[in-house]
Amino acid sequence: MSRFYLVKNYEKMSEKAAALLFAQITLKPDAVLGLATGSTPVGTYRKLTELYRAGRLDCSHITTVNLDEYLGLSAGHPQSYRSFMRKNLFDGIGLSADRTFFPEIPERLSDCRKNIPPSIGGIRNETNQDIETALAETCRQYDELLRSLGGTDLQLLGIGRNGHIGFKEPGDTF
């Protein structure tokens, strides 16, 4: 069930979101949390880190699943979403890497600029179809992982100024 909260400012939003996550983890210490990246949740992650450092939050049994990852960046790249999450939350709450999940981009697609040739006149070639197949398989595997975890107990999303969620822009089909 979705709930909406109207708050005064970013700081209050961060506090409210952190309080909701804190409550979920308190009620279910092995919660599966869906997390997002970007500027919106940074304040929330900072609040959770403060709760952890104060000894009020135990995250040792939670599992996290992130919305997305960049195609073309390795997991260790400083601009990857894994790096973002380690810096902004995981390291601050002592969360082990084996309890965090991201879409696994096939290694052979790690440098997409070399693997995705331009199409001519919108005609797809075999390489593009191979890449689409590999990405569809990545999505299928991530869906399977989410099902095996029983879905998410709580999903944190940021909505951009233009209404985008993740890389889904207004007008995109789901």
What are these regions (language model features)?
Residues Y10-E11, S39-G43:
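Gly/serine-rich nucleotide phosphate-binding loop at the start of the catalytic core
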Residues V32-A36, V65-D68:
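Short glycine-rich or small-residue beta-strand-to-loop segments that form or flank ligand, phosphate
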Residues M1, L57-L154:
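Ligand-binding beta-strand-loop-alpha-helix segment within the catalytic cores
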Residues L35-T40, L157-R161:
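Glycine-rich beta-strand-to-loop/alpha-helix junction loops that act as flexible
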Residues V42-R56, P78:
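Glycine-rich loop at the start of a catalytic domain that most often binds anionic cofactors/ligands
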Residues A18-T26, T49, R53, R86-F90, ...:
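Generic structural signal for well-ordered alpha-helical scaffold segments
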Residues G166-F174:
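Class I SAM-dependent methyltransferase SAM-binding "motif I" and its flanking Rossmann-like core
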Residues M1-L33, E50, T100, K114-I116, ...:
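N-terminal glycine-/serine-/threonine-rich phosphate-binding loop
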